[in-house]
């Protein structure tokens, strides 16, 4: 079966490597154009492109798939199926119709929950008990196509956006291989999504990481985990922007206003929240690396002291 793979970041690269290791015939790889990265802002290939280069697969990097020439180029590959994972380009209906079996998407949620760009982080921030991978038959909507296969995983109390991303990337590879095996046997059937259960995982922004201390400690703790490693969470102490890397939610409340530091011990800094108390255990001061509160105290830093106001 002739497969065209379309994807860009590490999540997609993991699935591509799994397909290659399973012996599938990838006749072409579509990925985003090279982007500037690093201190030198040098043009760098996407993780998916790097896998393709390492394995000798032809790479295609159109800015858009809307032009007829781009669609003709794809059609010339004569794909039986196109597998899409975090590609980053909209696929017009004409493209969806080119492969014999259409386009299959690897989506990092249990659809119809968390359609959209940031399902991994949104699931953690919302306090979901589980998430997973859905293999979906793509249509013209945003993650609205028929569901073909699902794998689920619990979200643990210490999962971060990073740890859950890596686990789901591995699961995505397993799921698409299972789907391809069923497709070859002719028993891959779709289930229509229930629109009443659908919600959207909107794209993340850096500003969303600004901690609102009027929220509950539990909500803030989940946000810190969800946004680790990107876009990260932060709070301001006067003119200083302090990044928060790890924290835990405590049930006990305080008579202090939200954002007030109420204690600083070696095991953490306690901050009053709208409900409960947040214990910060790892933070990053301007111009410094992330460090434990114990190390921060050992360094003599006079920040995050009782009575100080964070906002």
From Swiss-Prot:
It is an enzyme of class 2 (transferase). GO terms for cellular component: cytosol. The keyword Protein biosynthesis applies. Pfam families: Formyl_trans_C (PF02911), Formyl_trans_N (PF00551). It catalyses: L-methionyl-tRNA(fMet) + (6R)-10-formyltetrahydrofolate = N-formyl-L-methionyl-tRNA(fMet) + (6S)-5,6,7,8-tetrahydrofolate + H(+). Its EC number is 2.1.2.9. GO terms for molecular function: methionyl-tRNA formyltransferase activity. Keywords: Protein biosynthesis, Transferase. InterPro entries: Fmt, Formyl_trans_C, Formyl_trans_C_sf, Formyl_transf_N, Formyl_transf_N_sf, Formyl_transferase-like_C_sf, GART_AS, Met-tRNA-FMT_C. (6S)-5,6,7,8-tetrahydrofolate binds at residues 109-112. HAMAP family: Formyl_trans. Attaches a formyl group to the free amino group of methionyl-tRNA(fMet). The formyl group appears to play a dual role in the initiator identity of N-formylmethionyl-tRNA by promoting its recognition by IF2 and preventing the misappropriation of this tRNA by the elongation apparatus. Belongs to the Fmt family. This is Methionyl-tRNA formyltransferase. The gene is fmt.
């Amino acid at each position: 079966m002739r497969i065209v793979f379309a994807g860009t970041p590490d999540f997609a690269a993991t699935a591509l490597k799994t397909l290659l290791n399973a012996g599938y015939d990838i006749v072409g790889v579509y990925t985003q154009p090279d982007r500037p990265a690093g201190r030198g802002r040098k043009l760098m290939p996407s993780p998916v492109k790097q896998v393709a280069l390492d394995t000798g697969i032809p790479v295609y990097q159109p800015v858009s798939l809307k032009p007829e020439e781009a669609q003709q180029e794809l059609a010339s590959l004569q794909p039986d199926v196109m597998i899409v994972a975090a590609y980053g380009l909209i696929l017009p209906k004409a493209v969806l119709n080119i492969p014999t079996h259409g386009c299959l998407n690897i989506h990092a949620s249990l659809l119809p929950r968390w359609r959209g760009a940031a399902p991994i982080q949104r699931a953690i921030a919302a306090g979901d008990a589980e998430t997973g991978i859905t293999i979906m038959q793509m249509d013209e909507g945003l993650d609205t196509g028929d569901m073909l296969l699902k794998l689920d995983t619990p979200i643990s109390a210490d999962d971060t956006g990073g740890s859950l991303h890596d686990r789901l990337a591995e699961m995505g590879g397993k799921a698409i291989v299972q789907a391809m095996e069923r497709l070859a046997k002719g028993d891959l059937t779709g289930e229509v999504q229930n629109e009443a259960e659908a919600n959207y995982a909107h794209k993340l922004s850096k500003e969303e990481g600004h901690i609102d201390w009027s929220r509950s400690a539990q909500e803030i703790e989940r946000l810190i985990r969800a946004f680790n490693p990107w876009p990260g969470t932060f709070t301001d102490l006067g003119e200083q922007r302090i990044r928060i890397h790890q924290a835990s939610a405590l049930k006990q409340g305080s008579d202090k206003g939200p954002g007030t530091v109420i204690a600083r011990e070696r095991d953490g800094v306690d901050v009053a929240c709208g409900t409960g108390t947040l214990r910060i255990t790892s933070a990053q001061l301007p111009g410094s690396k992330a460090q434990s509160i114990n190390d921060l105290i050992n360094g003599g830093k006079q920040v995050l002291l009782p009575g100080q106001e964070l906002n």
